[in-house]
């Protein structure tokens, strides 16, 4: 679609709304007179208000959108940019509703973290109903989504109250998987092709662990959560997992640790000896992720395991004991149906895991789904799946405790973590709501530095490919040595 920005250059805001409303369109910025399918977004500054208008032409239909912001609310430069970008989105959205686009569950919101908009409303004293109504009016969010974000915001507020200024989380990324799932765009390395890289990668990781631990010690930080993810960390052998956990315990002061999570994920990598190693190192949370319990769908997405493998892996976890278990599901997988998803969720509930995370399929660039153009359930079918989850999970004693959104999600929905009472994963809340710093190590790991007052945020990302990670380990460790300065 052609985009014409008149009187401003808020490209990012215009493009985010374009991708939200018209996910199959890509932005173009032609010169000359406006033609074709297009959005003309004009900003006009008056004496009292600044107005944004949108003329939208799409498939022979034309509609207009308009919104204004009082100039008295635009005195701070940073706030001015934020408000005017929001006005560009709002005018575009209103025009799109004028040509009859179906209402989207999250209305005009385009961001990853809707909870960051809700938490301040509750913190300033609004009750749940008031906050939900304001959210609906301001962003045209559906009542069901407004209620959902209110409930997750309460979990955020509880987590905020429990964190001290010096509290941080640690993340360790292991970028290896036994096979690559069709929906995945993370550049994890197939062990069949690159097992030879694992020992050298772990040697480099040990150096980064040491450098990070020294920065943590010098800054006087307290590690409250440790999360090993990937990839699939349990791709490593029991001996390698033991060595990694030993290094972490020796390098960091873990006396303040409140949880230790390992994203086992794939049942074909979970063995009794690995579980015993993890329990010996105080790991108390683990994921066993079916995504679906339909063998036909599992084969379609390249998982290379069966539903029975999930049952067997979970039995091993329960026999080992001491783990809170999360199980991931994905709504909208190729070949799945609302009935199939219902059957999977009912079977998962019968397994009584402490957490259930319901993801919506995101058609990520770089995934095999995008390359193959695989047929997937439409937004209406995905909506049925999520509506069912939203009914049966609370009935089974689960409450939503974190949520986030991604680009190219089927139906424009969301990912939601559900928990039994008292079983929330603090790390998930902290990273999604940016409550504290996440110090990350390993392949593709993203360090996120957050000021306690929320006023500053920095990101540092390690290389994804193991070969690049190994080659750049000197630079990576040097950057970790500079972390201390952020906390001064």
Can you say where each PLM-predicted feature lies in the sequence?
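Radical SAM enzyme core and accessory elements
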Residues: 1-124, 128, 205, 421-488
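Short beta-strand motif preference
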Residues: 52-54, 172, 286-288
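Canonical Radical SAM [4Fe-4S] cluster-binding loop centered on the CxxxCxxC motif
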Residues: 167-202
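A C-terminal junction/extension of Radical SAM enzymes
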Residues: 32, 36-37, 366-441
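N-terminal [4Fe-4S]-dependent radical SAM core
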Residues: 100-103, 123-170
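Conserved non-cysteine loop/helix-boundary elements of the Radical SAM core domain that shape
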Residues: 188-389
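Beta-strand scaffold of nucleotide-dependent catalytic cores
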Residues: 173, 287, 355-359, 429, ...
């Amino acid at each position: 679609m052609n985009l014409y920005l008149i009187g401003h250059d808020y490209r990012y805001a215009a493009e985010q709304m374009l991708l939200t409303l018209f996910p199959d369109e890509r932005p173009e910025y032609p010169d000359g007179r406006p033609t074709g399918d297009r959005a003309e977004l004009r900003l006009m500054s008056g004496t009292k208000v600044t107005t944004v208008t949108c003329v939208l032409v799409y498939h022979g239909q034309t509609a207009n959108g308009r919104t204004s912001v009082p100039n008295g609310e635009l005195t701070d430069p940073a706030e001015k940019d934020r408000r005017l970008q929001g006005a560009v989105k709002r005018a575009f959205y209103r025009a799109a509703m004028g040509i009859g686009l179906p209402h989207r569950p999250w209305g005009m919101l385009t961001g990853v973290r809707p909870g960051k908009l809700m938490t301040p409303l509750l913190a300033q004293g609004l009750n749940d109903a008031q906050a939900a109504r304001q959210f609906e009016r301001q962003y045209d969010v559906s009542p069901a989504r407004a209620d959902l974000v209110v409930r997750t915001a309460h979990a955020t507020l509880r987590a905020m109250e429990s964190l001290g200024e010096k509290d941080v989380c640690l993340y360790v990324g292991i970028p290896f998987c036994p096979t690559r799932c069709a929906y995945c765009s993370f550049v994890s390395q197939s062990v069949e092709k690159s097992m030879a890289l694992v020992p050298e990668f772990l040697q480099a990781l040990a150096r980064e662990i040491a450098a990070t631990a020294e920065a943590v010690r010098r800054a006087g930080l307290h590690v409250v959560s440790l999360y090993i993810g990937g990839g699939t960390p349990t791709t490593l052998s029991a001996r390698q997992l033991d060595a990694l956990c030993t290094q972490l315990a020796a390098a960091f002061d873990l006396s303040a640790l409140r949880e230790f999570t390992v994203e086992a994920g794939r049942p074909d990598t979970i063995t009794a000896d690995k579980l015993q190693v993890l329990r010996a190192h105080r790991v108390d949370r683990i994921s066993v992720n079916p995504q679906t319990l339909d063998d036909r769908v599992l084969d379609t997405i390249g998982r290379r395991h069966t539903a029975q493998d999930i049952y067997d892996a979970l039995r091993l976890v329960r026999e080992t004991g001491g783990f809170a278990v999360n199980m991931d599901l994905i709504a909208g997988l190729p070949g799945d149906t609302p009935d199939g998803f219902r059957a999977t969720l009912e079977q998962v509930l019968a397994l009584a895991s402490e957490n259930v995370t319901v993801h919506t399929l995101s058609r990520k660039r770089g995934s095999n789904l995008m390359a193959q153009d695989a047929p997937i359930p439409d937004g209406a079918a995905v909506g049925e799946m999520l509506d069912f989850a939203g009914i049966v999970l609370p009935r089974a004693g689960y409450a939503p405790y974190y949520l986030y959104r991604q680009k190219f999600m089927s139906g424009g929905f969301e990912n939601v973590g559900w928990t039994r009472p008292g079983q929330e994963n603090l790390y998930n809340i902290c990273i999604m709501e940016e409550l504290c710093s996440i110090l990350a190590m390993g392949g593709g790991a993203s360090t996120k530095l957050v000021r306690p007052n929320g006023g500053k945020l920095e990101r540092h990302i390690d290389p994804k490919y193991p070969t690049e990670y190994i080659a750049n380990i000197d630079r990576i460790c040097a950057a970790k040595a500079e972390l201390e300065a952020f906390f001064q």
